[in-house]
Regions:
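Class I (Rossmann-like) S-adenosyl-L-methionine-dependent methyltransferase catalytic domain
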Residues: 1-49, 54-98, 122, 142-235
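Helix-loop segment at the mouth of the active site in Rossmann-fold oxidoreductases
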Residues: 99-101, 118
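Short catalytic micro-motifs in class I SAM-dependent methyltransferases
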Residues: 113-117
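A short glycine-rich, Lys/Arg-flanked "PGG" loop and its adjoining helix->strand segment in the class I
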Residues: 125-137
């Protein structure tokens, strides 16, 4: 992907999530069971980063663990909502490609449904390397992305954008799509960028960033809805 276009998509993603912030919070007020289960990787006394925290809902399952929680997101409106919902937590607007933290700062980093919104292999790798930079040696990256290949409606989008790419009508990379966000009345508010990772593609990318992959599996509300990966920063 052309880097100029990738930068445009990063800016577009920020604008899109500001546009849908209230709708997003309304439809994601609860914490699904698969995310609750990922909470088991955080322990008392640890510094934990919620990278791409959105409305802060991960904090709901971590707040009683006596951890030092930090939440960051590119959307100012989502951070405002998170601060209103959880005034005791630390939230700030920040870019996950250039984190405002020192090296070896965190014990754990949660990346829940974020990496698939990062355009281009260059920026995806930069995101992971930046996570590695701020993780302590031996620290864990807990990662989830959507498994578009197991979602029927999403698979149709893959076919559509693959066709557009083949006939030179798309600046996106192969396996990239735009997913419409609709209001309750059915109006399209935003067309969000996603990269449709495969299970092995995700694992290979995480390894390329210098992590050791401990576990990689499919799961979710329906079988195969998401891809999960636990990676360790080498000692």
């Amino acid at each position: 992907m052309d880097i100029e276009y990738a930068n445009y998509l990063l800016e577009k993603t920020t604008e899109d999530y500001n546009l849908i912030a209230e709708d997003y919070t309304r439809t994601r007020a609860y914490v699904p069971e698969d995310i609750r289960d990922l909470g088991k990787y955080a322990f008392a006394g640890e510094r934990v980063l919620d990278s791409g925290c959105a409305n802060g809902r991960l904090y709901e399952i971590l707040k009683d663990k006596e951890i030092n929680y930090f939440g960051i997101d590119i959307s100012k409106k989502l951070i405002q909502i998170a601060n209103q919902k959880y005034p005791k937590a630390k939230f700030q607007t920040a870019d996950a490609l250039n984190l405002p933290f020192s090296e070896n700062f965190f014990d754990k980093i949660y990346s829940i449904s974020i990496l698939h919104n990062i355009p281009s292999r260059k920026f995806q790798l930069q995101y992971l390397k930046e996570a590695s930079r701020v993780l302590k040696p031996g620290g864990l990256l807990i990662l989830r992305v959507w498994d578009f290949w197991r979602r029927k409606a999403a698979f149709k989008l893959i076919l559509k954008h693959t066709f557009l790419k083949l006939i030179n009508r798309s600046k996106l990379d192969f396996k990239d799509v735009f997913v419409p966000w609709k209001s309750s009345g059915g109006k399209i508010i935003a067309e969000r960028y996603f990269h449709c990772f495969t299970k092995m593609e995700l694992e290979n990318l995480v390894k390329k960033a210098g992590f050791k992959v401990k576990k990689n599996w499919r799961g979710g509300k329906d079988p195969g809805t998401n891809i999960y990966l636990i990676a360790k920063k080498p000692l």
